[in-house]
Amino acid sequence: MAEQIAGSQARSNKWGGVFASLPAFDLAPTRTALVIVDLQYLDAHRDYGMGAEAKRRGTEEKYDYYFSRIENVVVPNIQKLQQLCRQRGIEVIFMRIASLVKDCRDVSAVHKRLRLFAPSGSKEAEILEEIKPIENELVITKGCSGAFNGSNLDQILANLGIKTLMFAGVVTNYCVETSVRDAGDRDYDVILIDDGCAAFTPQQHRFALEILNDCYCKVMTTDEVIAFIETAIEAQPRTPLATTR
């Protein structure tokens, strides 16, 4: 199993000549979670939040690549991953940017400066309809970029017995990258899903993945992740059927 995830990597850390590569790891479905970062109306929809502000300023063309990638690549791939994870008993966890109070005074200084305001209960705080949580799935609020720094995610994962995290979402080189680094520093096994993330430009996305891969995480495509999960399921020992005498 460990050899499979190592062998599936066409990408490698270009600094590997000095630093040791990230060791291969196994995946246990009951100890794994798909973490979807900030795919909400605030920053992932053309008509709300950041998208609406870009239209107001007449700069919407600057973000066309970003929103197109979310619509045509990221959302369809996350839908596939959600379906598989739900079938296989893998936790699906949503991180969202939101404030606890209506005036947003509780969010970080960076988010205040960037005007990333999404009061709880607002449309901007909602997860995109196409990938919305189903009953009993966790939606965790954060008030800054990092999933760990801005919430009690670490404690929740410990309570769930989670060891492996599969990250998808936006923005690749901002909230996603921060969360991946923090997860690595907390000794989680981390997979970053290449075609489950989006940045404002292809270059920003690619550079973030090059920096993170084989150091803080293993970068994989959706199809690679699906194959990895299915192989892990197949490798699980099966309980023998009870026999009657």
Task: Explain the meaning of each model-derived region.
Residues 40-47:
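Short acidic, Gly/Ser-rich segments with clustered Asp/Glu that frequently serve as metal-coordination loops
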Residues 74-77:
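Conserved alpha-helical elements of sugar-nucleotide-dependent glycosyltransferases
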Residues 43, 64-70, 165-166:
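Surface-exposed cleft-lining segments at the edges of enzyme active sites
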